[in-house]
């Protein structure tokens, strides 16, 4: 099995697991400004070669010159669009800092002990409700972060998928970004530390 480097694309930065422990360090690209409702990495497109160079040097500092033998297991926000998935894949793959790239959404990583569950998370633009079964996203609803109703989301969660209506499912609140105060009483809260511990042990065979 190829060696894996877990990477998290958070709301404002990229977190990379260190080589010899389970801690994560932040990769910040100089000159990137936060814009409302727009993932920060969109700005990489305007200076793609420069961003890829900085990332490659960052990874070489962490993992040495043999970093190209690793597979990057990239954990992305739950509302990542198909085009964003492609951009993320191409950006990292062509940074010359890895052997290959694999992606999972945050919601798909929340539980190894449950084959099916509901996840709720918050990105820079949406609240995302998902039903996960055997690692696959079978249903999803998104709500604008400026107009959502906690009551409506709670009701929607009960009928997000026919499986839930008949047999129920555990409900996980992903509080990795510490921005889920409105939802903490809806289910089991996954703290920042718990989430990082889960991702630190992600392997590409699971991605």
Where are these regions (language model features)?
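Short N-terminal binding/cap micro-motifs at the start of the first secondary-structure element
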Residues: 11-18, 24
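Nucleotide/phosphate-binding catalytic cleft detector across ATP-hydrolyzing
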Residues: 1-10, 25, 32-124, 131-207
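Surface loops and adjacent helix of pleckstrin homology
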Residues: 17-20, 28-29, 132
């Amino acid at each position: 099995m190829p060696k894996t480097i877990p990477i998290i694309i958070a709301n404002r930065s990229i977190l990379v697991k260190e080589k010899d422990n389970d801690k994560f360090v932040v990769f910040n690209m100089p000159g990137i400004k936060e814009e409302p409702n727009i993932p920060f990495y969109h700005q990489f497109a305007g200076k793609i070669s420069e961003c890829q160079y900085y990332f490659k040097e960052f990874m070489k500092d962490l993992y040495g010159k043999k970093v190209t033998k690793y597979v990057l297991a990239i954990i992305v926000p739950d509302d990542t669009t198909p085009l964003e998935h492609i951009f993320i894949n191409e950006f990292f793959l062509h940074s010359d800092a890895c052997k290959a790239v694999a992606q999972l959404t945050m919601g798909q990583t929340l539980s190894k002990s449950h084959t099916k569950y509901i996840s709720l998370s918050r990105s820079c633009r949406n609240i995302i409700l998902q039903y996960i079964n055997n690692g696959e996203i079978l249903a999803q609803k998104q709500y604008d972060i400026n107009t959502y109703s906690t009551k409506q989301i709670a009701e929607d969660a009960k009928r997000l998928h026919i499986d839930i209506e008949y047999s129920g499912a555990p409900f996980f609140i992903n509080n990795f970004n510490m921005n889920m105060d409105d939802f903490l009483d809806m289910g089991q809260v996954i703290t920042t530390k718990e989430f990082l511990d889960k991702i630190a042990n992600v392997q590409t065979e699971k991605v």
